[in-house]
Amino acid sequence: EAAITDKTKALVLNNPSNPTGMIYSKEELEALAEVCLRHDIYIIADEIYYRLCYDGRKFTSVAALGEEVKKHTIIINGVSKSYSMTGWRCGFAACGDKRIAKVMTNCLSHALGNIGAMNQAAMAEAMRGPQDSVEEMRKVFEERRNYLVERMNQIDGVSCLKPDGAFYVMMNLEKLIGRTLGGRVIHNADDFAMAFLEKGLVAVVSCCAFDAPNFVRWTYATSLETIKEGLDRLEKFLKEG
């Protein structure tokens, strides 16, 4: 709340989170919504990973907390993640305030235009049709997550927490700071990511841009075989130095 100024217009809320994979509880969302309502701040809710929740965690949309919150919320969503339709480039925004919805529509029609009719039909069918395949994919993601987290925490020098949702793991490399790996002195995640790419031939995302310089992001949105190979290369990379 201390960060709010007279210039603050909106809070961007990513839930489930990229890059951490954490999920906000209903109580946390209520606390955030209360602050936003008190200061007349809109909530831009990025809920693209809403179907990917694990360990029985239930997703709560901030817009579902009441009519007043709904009017102050702009939901950003799509089918790229939960429905594995990345190449279709389909997304949408929804707002309980019709005035904002009209402005968004006008802006979109003049600046970008619409996505293809075929893409729109595919998105509608994905969201309206049977959801069995979506649940099957979620279960597979959960299995991959469990393997990645367990295996990573067995490797000396690195660790991670188990994420609640999405398909990312934040690997803690704090113990590697100061070491020389792949011919580079590791000062932060940028150094590690580059060294691991050059020597281990594995691409991870530095979290320096997320204000987490001692972490890199892994994804488990790939096959279990690829995950195993990546972790094998991590072990080899750390042992060889």
Language model segments and positions:
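PLP-dependent class I/II
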Residues: E1-G241
